[in-house]
């Protein structure tokens, strides 16, 4: 593992974060690696990390990680959620989902396990098997440690689980520190109230104890843990809207302001931060949400779940949300959290993971093209040339999901001879417009004719 050599000299230091080194003017091996992957200058990567506009989630205890970057200067990234639940799934199924997610292009993976076995064993196995950054929501295991009795949780319970995740090699954690007790009454006019699982746990704790959010009051302690291992904050949006009616409301925006304050507090200690966002947002409010986050959070990378642009399509929410995700990415969101067809209905299986990921790779790629990122359209142009030349195998190779493209083609024309045919089953051999090859010689003749007889052509029209 090459990265083992990179991090060996850092272990034991008080602060080993990428931001800490970047602010000292040091371009780490991870920054060089990211620069090569993004086709960007290493100094630009260092500068973006130093100012907090880019993060490289890279726990020093995750040596088999292939470093990647999340930030507006980099390509738009996609996260896939996996995780066992008490009612469904197990370790082997989750490892299979991890492999599938990586195969279909997940840039990071979050383990959201809430049951289904030994959570520490599941998490450790996922980290050891993963070349991509792993994120977690430690509040889930904190609740499991007290057998679901929210009121029994103490601040030390939260901190213990957070440190354990950091020691195990988790690269970023969702920390719901922006949900303050005074914000809870703001949800009373919502249709769906609080839809964040972590936020719901903390809300119950505050309602029972009538005390401030322990993740907020102990935020400095969490910073100290993150400094030691280079864990990045993914500041959770506990008050994200769970339906269009609740989008961009007072509760959501109040929490966002606090998330901005927490971002800057973490930066004071050179700890990396990204900020999570909605959710369910009408199309005409997506740009406002992205701009507002950049303003409140000093341009820390934005990481959104969707957003879904309509609430009436259960079973198709990978589509309703990919529409919003493409727009959010275009406006400057750095990472998109995928939504599967099972959203709101049940735990996704392997095929759901595949469908959700491909939908989001499409959204992220469309955003990269719209933002004119270097080389973003190269693959599109190459596939278009292959399509025009009826190079079917090359088209399949360049597709986001080569197996699905080949499968659909071969449903009607399975024989190998059709891989060189100048048609597909849509138009057949006589009606395919791409057979109309206008060569350079014919065009040159036409241009001469048009130049000579332009008036005559215009008159006849």
Curated annotation (Swiss-Prot):
One of its GO terms (cellular component) is cytosol. Keywords: 4Fe-4S, Iron, Iron-sulfur, Lyase, Metal-binding, S-adenosyl-L-methionine, Thiamine biosynthesis, Zinc. Its cofactor is [4Fe-4S] cluster. One of its GO terms (biological process) is thiamine diphosphate biosynthetic process. [4Fe-4S] cluster binds at residues 424, 427, 432. The keyword S-adenosyl-L-methionine applies. Substrate binds at residues 81, 110, 140, 176, 196-198, 237-240, 276, 303. Its EC number is 4.1.99.17. GO terms for molecular function: 4 iron, 4 sulfur cluster binding; carbon-carbon lyase activity; zinc ion binding. Pfam families: ThiC_Rad_SAM (PF01964). Binds 1 [4Fe-4S] cluster per subunit. The cluster is coordinated with 3 cysteines and an exchangeable S-adenosyl-L-methionine. The keyword Ligase does not apply. It catalyses: 5-amino-1-(5-phospho-beta-D-ribosyl)imidazole + S-adenosyl-L-methionine = 4-amino-2-methyl-5-(phosphooxymethyl)pyrimidine + CO + 5'-deoxyadenosine + formate + L-methionine + 3 H(+). Gene3D superfamilies: 6.10.250.620, Radical SAM ThiC family, central domain (3.20.20.540). Pathway: Cofactor biosynthesis; thiamine diphosphate biosynthesis. Zn(2+) binds at residues 280, 344. Catalyzes the synthesis of the hydroxymethylpyrimidine phosphate (HMP-P) moiety of thiamine from aminoimidazole ribotide (AIR) in a radical S-adenosyl-L-methionine (SAM)-dependent reaction. NCBIfam families: PRK09284.1 (NF006763), PRK13352.1 (NF009895), thiC (TIGR00190). Belongs to the ThiC family. PANTHER family: PHOSPHOMETHYLPYRIMIDINE SYNTHASE, CHLOROPLASTIC (PTHR30557:SF1), THIAMINE BIOSYNTHESIS PROTEIN THIC (PTHR30557). This is Phosphomethylpyrimidine synthase. It comes from Thermosynechococcus vestitus (strain NIES-2133 / IAM M-273 / BP-1). The lineage of its organism: Bacteria, Bacillati, Cyanobacteriota, Cyanophyceae, Acaryochloridales. The gene is thiC.
